[in-house]
């Protein structure tokens, strides 16, 4: 079914309006001529002809159908312009590209051409009745709303005198409560009634601009602000921050501002773990592996980004836990339904980390020290030259810990070594070191680029391995080391080609190398002693020094086009290629291989906004092309390498929609749906060389995700604010990927569960009084059940309708803080805070196996933390003290692996602007 050319659209004004704007405002998109330069190979020639034919067909169809339904209204045709597709056939150039991107043509270009053809074929034959019905219903509502629109849209961009975009600039209508803020790109959009208005543009540190306009049509107006050394009188308007706007969007998303807690925060994991519906389960102390779940879906079902680019680009071992918190402005958590603009195949959700975007030079440095020999140091800085637009941003983060906390009630040998007893020994081989250093340099505010940056980064981690996947498997000499280099180029241009169009492009390449050292013929115990063994510690085989080189290439292009104040289009292309070059220095039985997994993801989004922004709609579609090239053949009985072809290309299609309607500030409702696809990543398919076996026959996960939420902000009295949100969700997952533990070997493997259904509810409420007293509480319930009725042999499955094991299903958290202003000096403040986290007990294995009263379970946990922060000189200098787990509870997470007990930390931070 072709949605845009079916009879419904032809017989309504929707298609006519949409096509009129598209044809008249997109220069050369439908009227250009595509030429091919010499030197292109036949496959590239076919691609050119395919694209050219598609453009010509679209042009003819749009103009023909507009002519049928409008005889008097003519469409302004843009000047005819040639579009030249440059395809080089130079052999030397091909060789250089091939040596840098590895097999570029085989793994990237061919699947990309295949993807373009499959997009057209898939869309033409896809049958999604439920989605179409919802789509048509919302479009009908949109048609009704078009007649009710009597607002004029004033939009534009605010910059300083050097052309640098300014964020959080207020654009207000004088003598009214109407107003808005600019975003990170300096863009704004404000709806007003037709007529004459006076607009006030103001920002702290800049001179205020007042201008009067007589508006009867939509208008674009840019402003340039001049710096001011005098205080600017504030303009009172009702506006919303970017975090508030995102929370109130059509999709289910939480935003976490880092700035209020940056002085006491040591790791992003601490902040994210206090969010409703989100649970982080760590295997140990600082630097340990962790698993993050969103609404019951976890592991690699959740994707991580930094400024819209996959976090993997910094290195495979750069995570939320060791990313410098000084870099971060806020964290966006998408639940279940992920916008196509991120260009990902996430199934359960996504975490997008937004870095700081200060407009002036600054230095932000911090150092913390704590229990278990823990040290952290972070530096983030920015140096700007206002006249030239030159910007340099260095950053570095260092973490170190011995993690020598005590293990409670574990089996160990007595002093003579002749019998086993239970004791509380210290961890003795769990040291961790990480380094992340990066520098970014570029220019802003030029006519050819609003932002152009080149960056380079280096990350390194050294991790001693103390246990396997269970704590009874003790190591004493094994370790894992990794380092990664990254170079990237980022280009942003606002009003690209035409007014309202924004282009963002990123090219990134990472050289990632990890080594697992497992050479000791020893078996260790918790007392630190050992006996000589005939096998190495991790794999139980010959000594090994195993190398994994996983180069990562990322290409991301995002084109956003705001057609007017009510309609927008977003086109996103994302390519991700991960190599897997593995070999061993000692183990001659280990078979080297050079595998690769390449993904192409194309996303298209159409958004609407009506009734002064009260109603927002979003519709999106995603096309996925997966191209694995698997060459490893060893351990075929475990990995399934004898059951797959070496190189395959498969295509998948996803889609979704979202609707939000805000009745008034205290009450709003939103619903969203996505048919999502999640392709297995290299770590799941190919293992990690230490504790995870490969499984090359893994199937992609598919899920139908639904969210329904009520939320609102209520001001019961002056200086009092209450925010609440209640959310219900459904996740119907096929080929659910989860970990299977092989306890005898201390190994894990990712496997498919045919079907899992997850349903749940969550709620959160926040209270704020005058920015001083802040309270928060949330609770989450998740019911994940196995839906496989029969095994592969046809026999009934004993675990049918059982809860999925080893996953928290009921948990919650609470926070309280109070800030004293001007307590000792005029420009200081003292903040007292505490947090509480609770997790209900859950079974370690399937509840159908064994006796429910005696089978292993992870007990309920109650973790309390307290902190105090003192700041002076307008937050320039800050000292924070924290006690985590001050009740010294025994805390377990993954596979009953103990976490640290009571610990103390101190942090000093200085911010110079």
What are these regions (language model features)?
Residues 723-724, 729-732, 751-843:
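Gram-negative outer-membrane beta-barrel transporters
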Residues 269-310:
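Extracytoplasmic beta-strand/coil segments of soluble accessory domains associated
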Residues 662, 670-674, 701-759, 780, ...:
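Membrane-embedded beta-barrel scaffold of Gram-negative outer-membrane proteins
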Residues 368, 387-471:
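Periplasmic-side early beta-strands and strand-to-turn transitions of outer-membrane beta-barrels
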Residues 159-161, 169-174, 202-206, 216-260:
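Short, acidic, small-residue-rich periplasmic hinge/interaction motif at the N-terminus
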Residues 116, 222-223, 325-364:
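A beta-strand signature from Gram-negative outer-membrane beta-barrel systems
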Residues 439-461, 480-640, 644-666, 672-674, ...:
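Face-selective signature of the C-terminal outer-membrane beta-barrel domain
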Residues 188-191, 309-336:
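Short acidic/polar hinge/loop motifs at secondary-structure boundaries
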């Amino acid at each position: 079914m072709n949605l845009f050319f079916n009879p419904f659209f032809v017989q309504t004004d929707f298609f006519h309006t949409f096509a009129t704007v598209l044809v008249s405002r997109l220069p050369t998109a439908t009227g250009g001529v595509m030429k091919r330069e010499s030197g292109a190979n036949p496959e590239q020639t076919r691609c050119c002809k395919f694209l050219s034919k598609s453009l010509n067909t679209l042009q003819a169809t749009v103009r023909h159908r507009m002519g049928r339904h409008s005889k008097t209204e003519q469409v302004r045709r843009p000047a005819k312009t040639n579009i030249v597709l440059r395809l080089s056939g130079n052999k030397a150039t091909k060789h250089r590209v091939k040596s840098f991107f590895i097999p570029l043509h085989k793994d990237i270009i061919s699947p990309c051409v295949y993807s373009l053809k499959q997009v057209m074929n898939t869309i033409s034959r896809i049958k999604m009745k439920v989605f179409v019905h919802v789509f048509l219903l919302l479009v009908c509502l949109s048609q009704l709303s078009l007649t009710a629109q009597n607002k004029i849209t004033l939009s534009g961009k605010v910059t300083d005198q050097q052309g640098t975009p300014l964020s959080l600039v207020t654009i207000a209508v004088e003598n009214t409560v109407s107003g808005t803020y600019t975003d990170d790109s300096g863009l704004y959009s404000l709806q007003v009634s037709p007529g004459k208005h006076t607009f006030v543009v103001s920002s702290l540190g800049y001179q205020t601009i007042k201008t009067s306009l007589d508006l009867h049509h939509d208008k674009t107006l840019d402003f340039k602000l001049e710096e001011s050394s005098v205080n600017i009188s504030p303009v009172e308007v009702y506006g919303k921050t970017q975090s508030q706007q995102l929370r109130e969007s059509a999709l289910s998303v939480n935003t976490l501002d880092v700035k209020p807690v940056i002085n006491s925060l040591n790791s992003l994991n601490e902040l994210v773990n206090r969010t409703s519906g989100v649970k982080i389960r760590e295997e140990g102390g600082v630097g340990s592996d962790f698993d993050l779940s969103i609404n019951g879906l976890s592991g690699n079902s959740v994707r991580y980004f930094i400024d819209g680019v996959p976090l993997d680009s910094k290195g495979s071992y750069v995570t939320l836990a060791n990313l410098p918190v000084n870099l971060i402005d806020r964290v966006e958590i998408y639940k279940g339904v992920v916008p196509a603009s991120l260009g990902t195949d996430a199934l359960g959700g996504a975490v997008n980390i937004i870095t700081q975007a200060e407009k002036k030079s600054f230095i932000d440095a911090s150092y913390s020290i704590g229990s278990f020999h823990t040290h952290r140091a972070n530096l983030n800085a920015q140096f700007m030259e206002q006249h030239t637009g030159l910007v340099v941003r260095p950053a570095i983060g260092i973490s170190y810990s011995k993690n020598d906390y005590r293990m409670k009630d574990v089996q160990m040998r007595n002093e003579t070594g002749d019998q086993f007893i239970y004791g509380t020994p210290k961890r003795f081989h769990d040291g961790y070191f990480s380094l992340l250093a990066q520098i970014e340099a570029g220019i802003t505010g030029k006519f050819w680029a609003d932002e152009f940056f080149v960056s380079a980064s280096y990350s390194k981690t050294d991790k001693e391995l103390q246990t396997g996947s269970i704590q009874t498997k003790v190591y004493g000499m094994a370790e894992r080391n990794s380092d990664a280099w990254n170079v990237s180029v980022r280009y942003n241009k606002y009003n690209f080609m035409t007014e309202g169009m924004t282009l963002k492009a990123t090219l990134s390449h990472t050289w990632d190398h990890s080594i697992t050292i497992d050479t000791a013929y020893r078996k260790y115990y918790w007392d630190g002693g050992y006996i000589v063994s005939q096998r190495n510690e991790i794999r139980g085989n010959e000594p090994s020094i195993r190398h994994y080189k996983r180069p990562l290439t990322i290409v991301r292009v995002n084109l956003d086009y705001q057609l007017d104040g009510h309609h927008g289009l977003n086109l996103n292309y994302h390519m991700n290629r991960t190599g897997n070059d593995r070999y061993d220095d000692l183990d001659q039985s280990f078979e080297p291989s050079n595998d690769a997994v390449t993904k192409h993801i194309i996303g298209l989004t159409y958004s609407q906004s009506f009734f002064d922004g009260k109603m927002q709609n979003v519709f999106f579609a995603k096309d996925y092309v997966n191209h694995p090239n698997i060459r490893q053949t060893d351990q075929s009985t475990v990995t399934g390498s004898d059951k797959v072809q070496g190189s395959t290309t498969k295509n998948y299609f996803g889609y979704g929609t979202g609707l939000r309607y805000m009745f008034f500030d205290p009450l709003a409702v939103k619903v969203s749906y996505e048919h999502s696809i999640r392709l297995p990543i290299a770590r799941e398919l190919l293992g990690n060389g230490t504790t995870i076996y490969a499984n090359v026959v893994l199937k992609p996960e598919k899920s139908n995700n639904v969210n329904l939420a009520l939320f609102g902000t209520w001001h019961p009295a002056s200086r009092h604010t209450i925010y609440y949100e209640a959310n219900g969700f459904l996740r119907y997952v096929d080929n659910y990927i989860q970990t299977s533990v092989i306890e005898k070997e201390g190994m894990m493997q990712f496997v498919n569960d045919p079907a899992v259904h997850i349903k749940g509810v969550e709620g959160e409420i926040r209270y704020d009084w005058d920015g001083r007293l802040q309270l928060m509480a949330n609770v989450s319930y998740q019911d994940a059940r196995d839906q496989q009725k029969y095994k592969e042999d046809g026999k009934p499955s004993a675990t049918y309708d059982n809860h999925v094991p080893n996953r928290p299903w009921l948990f919650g958290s609470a926070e309280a803080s109070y800030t004293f202003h001007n307590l000792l000096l005029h420009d200081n403040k003292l903040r007292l805070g505490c947090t509480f986290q609770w997790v209900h007990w859950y079974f370690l294995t399937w509840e159908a196996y064994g006796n429910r009263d005696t089978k292993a379970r992870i007990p309920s946990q109650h973790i309390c933390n307290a902190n105090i922060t003192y700041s002076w000189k307008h937050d320039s200098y800050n000292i924070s003290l924290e006690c985590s787990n001050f009740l010294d509870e025994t805390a377990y997470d993954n596979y009953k692996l103990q976490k640290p007990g009571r610990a103390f930390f101190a942090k000093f931070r200085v911010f110079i602007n």
